[in-house]
């Protein structure tokens, strides 16, 4: 079985094609800067006998043109003979709202609902839908599966996902915590349970997906019971350009003091805050270099980021009562050893003790970073959201075939 995974952003298309016999990628790539003056198309073959790599700078007018280019080059490069041989297409859809708690086979009704949910994810859901619509028109016989970023967190109890606002706002406008990075949190939790030889339905963990966008999740008996992101990905941890948790009155105060519109203030909170807001840079590599040279702003940004993560670990330790593992994943979680070290520093009394030599040289695969005989295991796990989407799509297709 061959499954194509598509992840359409506001100006990009990421894709990965899998052979599901061995869960191995056949190809991966990216179309970026869509709609801009000059875009870029990258496609890499992962076949043993074919290690071709395509890199082209060209105009990519819209998502449909980008998808046509990907389709054309997958056959031209000899990765697949015919696009129609693909058994299913799995789509990452950011916002599933209250409607979608699991992967779903796409039909007209599902497409309408994804469109209706665009109000909660105006940058992402319309792009996700564009990919679905393209395939529906060009290859209507290929089953499409929508896998929602929010679905893993659908198991949160109401006391964790509700905001203490007038209840009618939830009833009318579905204002509540949804959480994101669900596909990543789900994937690494399953990998961790397998690695530690704990049945997944008995596994408890705190998962930290740390990157330019970051979130924490409390996982109890294999299910999400709380997460740091909220109605949107702005809430929670300090991120590359997002502020994370703040007093909501700050929005009104900035608008009054700086004479800004609501739209301008929200742009500041989403795109000019976080690490970038504190030290002028959201590249962790640059921040680390500056910090080591004694740069006060870089040091402050790093310390604020670490402190916020520690607060969430502490809160989720109380929520979960028993914790089997702390999981680090995402671009920073996987690659930023100094961040992992600082997050774990001083948590020994909670049963969390990092083995520094392993942390400094963790390799590229799943690794246990804990000192021997510690109560809670610290795991560094490379996430693979595309594979998780492919696995969920495969499961759906097999169910359809049985029916």
Curated annotation (Swiss-Prot):
Protein localization: Cytoplasm
GO BP annotation list: acetate metabolic process; acetyl-CoA biosynthetic process
Catalytic reaction(s) noted: acetate + ATP = acetyl phosphate + ADP
Signal peptide interval: none
Cofactor(s) listed in the protein's UniProt record: Mg(2+); Mn(2+)
Assembly: Homodimer.
Protein's name in the database: Acetate kinase
Lineage: Bacteria, Pseudomonadati, Campylobacterota, Epsilonproteobacteria, Campylobacterales
Gene: ackA
């Amino acid at each position: 079985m061959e499954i194509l995974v598509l992840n359409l952003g506001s100006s990009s298309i990421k894709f990965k094609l899998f052979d599901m016999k061995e869960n191995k990628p056949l190809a991966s790539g990216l179309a970026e800067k869509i709609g801009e003056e000059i875009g870029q198309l990258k496609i890499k073959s992962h076949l043993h006998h074919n290690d071709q790599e395509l890199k082209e700078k060209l105009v990519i007018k819209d998502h449909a043109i980008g998808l046509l280019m990907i389709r054309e080059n997958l056959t031209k490069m000899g990765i697949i003979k015919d696009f129609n041989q693909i058994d299913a297409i799995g789509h990452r859809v950011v916002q599933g709202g209250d409607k979608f708690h699991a992967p779903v086979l796409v039909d007209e009704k599902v497409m309408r609902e994804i469109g209706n949910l665009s109000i909660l994810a105006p940058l992402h859901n319309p792009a996700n839908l564009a990919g679905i619509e393209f395939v529906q028109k060009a290859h209507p016989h290929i089953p499409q599966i929508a896998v929602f970023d929010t679905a893993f967190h659908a198991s949160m109890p109401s006391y964790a996902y509700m905001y203490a606002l007038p209840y009618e706002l939830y009833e009318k406008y579905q204002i509540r915590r949804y959480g994101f990075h669900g596909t990543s949190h789900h994937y690494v939790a399953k990998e961790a349970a397998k690695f530690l030889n704990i049945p997944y339905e008995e596994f408890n963990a705190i998962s930290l997906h740390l990157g330019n966008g970051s979130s924490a999740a409390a996982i109890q008996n294999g299910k999400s019971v709380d997460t740091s992101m909220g109605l949107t990905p702005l809430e929670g941890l300090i991120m590359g350009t997002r502020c994370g948790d703040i007093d909501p009155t700050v929005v009104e105060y900035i608008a009054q003091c700086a004479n800004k519109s609501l739209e301008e203030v929200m742009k500041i909170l989403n795109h000019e805050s976080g690490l970038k807001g504190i030290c002028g840079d959201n590249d962790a590599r640059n921040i680390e270099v500056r910090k080591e040279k004694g740069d006060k702003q870089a040091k402050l940004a790093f310390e604020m980021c670490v402190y916020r993560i520690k607060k969430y670990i502490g809160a989720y330790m109380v929520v979960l009562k028993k914790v089997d593992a702390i999981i680090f994943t995402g671009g920073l979680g996987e690659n930023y050893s100094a961040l992992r070290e600082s997050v774990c520093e001083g948590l020994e009394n909670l049963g969390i003790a990092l083995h520094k030599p392993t942390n400094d040289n963790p390799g590229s695969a799943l690794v246990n970073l804990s000192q021997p005989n510690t109560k809670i295991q610290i795991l560094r796990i490379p996430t693979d959201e595309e594979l998780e989407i492919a696995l969920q799509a495969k499961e759906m297709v097999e169910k359809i075939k049985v029916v």
